[in-house]
Amino acid sequence: AAFPGSHMGYNQGGEPTEIPSMTWQEVKDYHTAYYHPSNSLTTVYGAIDDPAAFLALLDEAFSPYEAKAFDFSTPDYTPVTSPVEKVCQYPVYEGTETENAAVTYITFICENATEEEQNVLDLLTMLLSDSSSALVSNLVDVLPNADISVYLETDGPEPAVVFVATGMNEGDVQTLRECIYASVLEFAENGVSQDILDAIASSLTMETALMSEESDLGVNMAQNIAYCWATTGDVHAYEKTIANMDNFEKYQTEGKYAEVAKKYLTEDN
């Protein structure tokens, strides 16, 4: 609903109604069209004793392929110019409890947000998602069974801030929406206390540091680097995301959180 006609507007797993009628040839044709070295990023982790020999192996693996250009433009994408609401039903097993079983996504499209604004929004979503935030506290008051998280989506034609709530009913959407508006304005006006800011920043910094202790560090790093490259076109995007963690206090001191919150996350947007 947020990005009609774009790649992001389609289910990543495919259109369920089309899958049963797909032929094996169609699957192979799709694989041939998109599973290609020119549409990939090769990442290497660990010590390489003989770089020349390693590069020779890569050359041997990739040499059978001709370089190929890929077009990821979205000519059918039509930007939304007013609020859009879409309700989707999903099947459940007979006897499944459906009370408070709705999942709600509220998306704010941040049209033309600069790289710096996206960096600020990324940290802002982490602050809003924290259990000590005004948003979480206010939501408990009006929808005690609901849980909420917030994240910055960069896969679409425009960056977007997405609020995801579970443990609610379809009829609670307006209550959720009003809670988000009020909480964002409260945050914009009051910011967050230094103690909470320090605690959240320290927790995320520790979480990032502990990644180096994981046994599958190389695999996880490669996946993160590749994902950030695919969504931004910048092979250093993941590094920049990690470095941005140092800016929690800086953005608050400079009033950046309030600035982007009022610009992109209010009822008028």
PLM region spans:
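Charge-rich, well-structured scaffold segments of protease-associated domains
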Residues: 1-75, 101-104, 110-114, 132, ...
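Short, surface-exposed beta-strand/loop micro-motifs that present aromatic residues
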Residues: 29-33, 86-95
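A broadly conserved detector of short glycine/acidic/proline-rich loop/turn motifs that flank catalytic sites
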Residues: 46, 92-94, 109-112, 127
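Cys/His-rich Zn2+-binding cysteine-cluster or related metal-binding knuckle/ribbon modules and their
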Residues: 75-81
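Acidic/His-enriched low-complexity segments
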Residues: 81-89, 195
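A generic structural signal for well-ordered coil/turn residues at beta-strand boundaries
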Residues: 84, 100-102, 120-122, 159
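Active/ligand-binding-proximal structured segments within catalytic/core domains
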Residues: 115-128
